[in-house]
Amino acid sequence: MRSRWQTLRKWIVKAVLLFFVSSLGFVLLYRFVPVPLTPLMVIRSVSSVWGEEFVGIHKDWVPLEEIAPSVQKAVLKAEDYRFFEHNGFDFDAIEKAMKYNKTHKRKKGASTITQQTAKNVFLWPQRDWVRKGLEAYFTILIESTWPKERIMEVYLNVIELGPGVYGVEAASQKYFKRSAKNLNPYQASLIAAVLPNPRRFRIDRPSNYVVGRQRRILNRVAPAIPKAADASLLDFLDLKFDSEEDESAN
């Protein structure tokens, strides 16, 4: 019995060491090379086989300097305005979210951009305690080995922005027919507006909630830009989608 326990303990130690070495290796690798594929991309694509429509993987990696500064500003304002101040965990935001969630049915999150990057690059989408623990682990590794600019670059290249669409460049080409470096503040704010839940909120079919959120983000990113008085900002500055083009052709 004792020998079995010793053997099991050795295997556990080996498994833990293997996980630590391999995870650290991938984190260090992605510090320098583009992320080719993520678990989320695979899970979404495979699960769509049994759905109404197959969803492929559309992505196009670009360096941070080829993404419009307005996109970076919009994402920071919408998701993590203290990104350059914290070390991966925003404890003030966590405390505020806990207080808010005690009195509201709609729960509020406090994940930082680094935490979202850790989840998007290395983990699965379903929420559970194991994933949250691993998310914290990868967040610490990322913050310890990547500069903030690299974290932002990876984040903007792997985030889900519609069915089968990953990264700002792929979203820019699909929805706006332009590269990410040519996005204007309106488009950048619309992209940031769907980030809380890109499966529920759509860039090509924005709800009133998304449009309202877009306005608030835009006010923070570019307060000097004139705002629309009526329902939507989508008529401004070439905000024309495939769906609108299809309707006009019919």
Curated annotation (Swiss-Prot):
GO molecular function list: pentosyltransferase activity; peptidoglycan glycosyltransferase activity
GO BP term, pick one: regulation of cell shape
Cellular location(s): Cell inner membrane
Q: How does it sit in the membrane?
A: Single-pass membrane protein
Give its E.C. classification number: 2.4.99.28
The family database entries (Pfam families) matched by this protein are listed as: Transgly
Similarity comment: family membership:
Belongs to the glycosyltransferase 51 family.
Q: Tell me, what does this protein do in biology?
A: Peptidoglycan polymerase that catalyzes glycan chain elongation from lipid-linked precursors.
Its recorded name reads Biosynthetic peptidoglycan transglycosylase
